Design a protein with these regions (language model features):
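Generic hydrophobic, aliphatic-rich segments that mediate packing or membrane embedding
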Residues: 53, 74-85, 89-93, 97-104, ...
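Glycine- and aromatic-rich loop/turn segments at beta-sheet edges
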Residues: 21-43, 82-97, 126-147, 180-203
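Extended ligand-binding clefts on enzyme/binding-domain cores
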Residues: 166-225
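Well-ordered alpha-helical segments within folded domains of soluble proteins
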Residues: 46-63, 95-110, 145-162, 201-218
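Internal, well-ordered domain-core segments that constitute the primary functional module
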Residues: 108-174
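Low-complexity, Ser/Thr/Pro/Gly-enriched N-terminal "stalk/linker" regions
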Residues: 1-67, 71-77, 121-123, 173-184
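Residue-level recognition of alpha-helical structural elements
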Residues: 3-7, 46, 70-74, 93, ...
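Positions within ordered alpha-helical repeat solenoids
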Residues: 17-20, 24, 63-66, 87, ...
Length: 225
């Protein structure tokens, strides 16, 4: 067996295991952890998210499309995921890439191109000059917009520009200006906390300056600046 065939077999085996974990309760869902001791798991609050929910199945299905045709079972799963995410996107208020509408945009664009317009429209409705208010209570009692890629404005900008469509430029412009407004000027250049003024800082991509700088570059290109 060639190395490529071995990797393919491993990937198919892992995917088959994931498929066996898909449950049904008003649409498909996945348990975050699989334990033989937990006889009757229930859907988590983030069941639809890109991070640990059904939206996270979309990149896998898209990768499968590059290698082979979907099976009937895989196609049915994709259709169920799309229906569930479309219904949720119409009322969802969490904006983020990994836990909210940004993830809806990503998954819908991958599984049913064009349907992501619903989630993008919702993001356009929810945007403020400071970005998008969070539901994650990163700081107790506060819904102030976050800045980072995972939970904040940077991730929303990246998702919207990647997906494109009528709302993409407005989201990129508003998000980019919000990020610039949230920046702190230092001797070394601009720097960001996950909320403006927060003492803790990170240089990393997921929650820090590298990711925000990348989102600003993408936003600037989308806005022709």
């Amino acid at each position: 067996m060639t190395a490529g065939a071995a990797y393919r077999e491993l990937g198919e085996s892992a995917w088959s295991w994931v498929m066996r974990q898909v449950r049904e309760d008003d649409g498909p869902w996945l348990p975050v952890d699989v334990s033989e001791d937990e006889a009757s798991p229930v859907p988590g609050k983030d069941r639809d998210s890109l991070y640990d929910g059904i939206a996270g199945l979309a990149p896998v299905l898209a990768e499968i499309d590059l290698q082979r045709s979907r099976t009937d079972v895989e196609q049915e799963l994709a259709d169920r995921v799309v229906r569930r995410l479309l219904a949720g996107a119409q009322v969802r208020v969490e904006p983020s890439l990994f836990d909210g509408l940004g993830g809806d945009v990503t998954a819908l664009r991958l599984l049913a191109p064009g349907s992501e317009a619903v989630a993008l429209g919702r993001l356009a409705d929810l945007m403020t000059p400071a970005g998008w208010r969070t539901t994650r209570e990163f700081e107790p009692g506060s819904d102030a917009p976050l800045t980072d890629v995972i939970m904040g404005t940077a991730g929303v900008v990246l998702a919207a520009v990647w997906a494109g469509g009528e709302h993409a430029e407005a989201i990129a412009t508003t998000g980019g200006e919000a990020l610039l407004g949230a920046a702190d000027e230092t001797d070394a250049g601009l720097d960001w906390g996950m909320v403006p003024g927060r003492q803790s800082r990170g240089p990393n991509y997921s929650h820090g300056t590298a990711g925000i700088a990348g989102a600003l570059a993408v936003a600037g290109a989308a806005a022709h600046r």
